[in-house]
Regions:
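Structural/interface elements that position substrates and couple domains in central-metabolism enzymes
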Residues: 1-105
């Protein structure tokens, strides 16, 4: 049940501000109906980073902590990441050239 999901609150706010949202979540098929229609769902975390200006991590899936910052850097237009769950290794992402903002650090 995603009705009170903090991630959806952030996504809806970003859409209201004019952002184009590409999203990936390993459990998205179970909750597809709750996702705003403006959100483009991708097949993988790498796919949704192609051409992105900012990577925003809103959930704590283990898969996000395993992302290779160097691989993601080659896909994105700008190297900026906001990690709201602190699942990414800050040093690895900064070493790959990212401006990394963790929330709560």
């Amino acid at each position: 049940d995603l009705r009170e999901s903090p991630a959806l609150v952030v996504i809806k706010h970003l859409i209201d501000e004019g952002a184009k949202i590409q999203a990936w979540d390993p459990a998205i098929k179970e909750h597809h109906a709750a996702i705003p229609q403006q959100v483009e769902l991708g097949e993988s975390p790498i796919a949704v980073c192609r051409g992105a200006e900012v990577l925003v991590v809103l959930t704590e899936w283990d898969e996000f902590g395993l992302l290779d910052a160097e691989v993601i850097a080659r896909e994105m237009d700008r190297l900026a990441v906001v990690d709201t769950r602190n699942v990414l290794n800050r040093k690895d992402w900064q070493a790959a050239g990212f401006v990394h903002q963790g929330i709560g650090r």
